Structure formats: structure tokens, C-alpha cells
Amino acid sequence: MRGAMTELSMAKLDRVLETALYVDDLERAARFYIDVLALEPLFEDERLRAFAVGGVNVLLLFRRGVSATTARLPGGTIPPHDGSGPLHVAFGIGDEELAGWEARLEAHQIAVEGRTAWPRGGHSIYFRDPDGHLVELATRGLWKIY
């Protein structure tokens, strides 16, 4: 029993690898994340687009409804998932980059809906993507770990 407990206690999660948003117009959403947020495309098909974020995370954009049934792939299956309504995603940015991001959003005619100064010293700005999802750009000082 002691060996089993040791194995269990050593099991650790490394990071959130993928975050998914569900969109009505896949091409429109992809253009937003490429043009406005400068994300690097990793993969695309008729169901989804995948983007690299910071070299270690992946943002997935699924065409709304297509993932609500089991996806059958050559290597196995992906169980159903979907989302509705305005969801939230936050991206980390450097302190010195906040003003540049605000200027970039203004250049793309994207309204900043909110700004927050956090007790730990971080700052966040909030805006919407074309599907109404709330996008946050946050500097360090938001959480104890970031």
C-alpha cells in the first residue's frame, strides 16, 4: 500500500495545455486571433483552429456544435464537449507591454471594456472577440503564482 501512495503523491500536473473557445464563424475568429493577438497558427481543419500561445500553451477555436459528438480519429476518440455564451480567456503580458497592447487594440478599433489594477500590483485590460468572448490581457501581479 505504501508504494501505491508514493506513486499517487508523485502524480503532478505540469500546466494547462489547451484552452478551448467555441465560435460561430471559424474563419472570422481565426483572423481575429492572428491579426489582433498575433497568435501563431499550429493546425486547422473544418472543425477547429489551434494556436500557439507563449510557446507552451495552445488556444483551440472550435466551430460551435461540431465537437458536441464524439470525434473519431485514426488513433482513438475524443469525447464530446462544447460551450455556449460568452466565455473568458486571459493571456499574460509583460508590464512594459500594456500600453502597446492598448494601442494595438485601438488600431484594430477594439474597445477596451474594463481595466483593473490588482492588489498584488498587476493590471488587466478586457475586451471582446468577434463571438463575444471576454479576452483579458494581464501583467504579473494578478495571482500569487503570476
Tell me what each language-model feature is.
Residues Y22-A68:
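Core segments of cupin and vicinal oxygen chelate
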Residues R2-E27, P86-V89, I93, G141-Y146:
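N-terminal beta-strand motif that seeds the catalytic metal site of vicinal oxygen chelate
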Residues R2-K12, E102-Y146:
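Vicinal oxygen chelate
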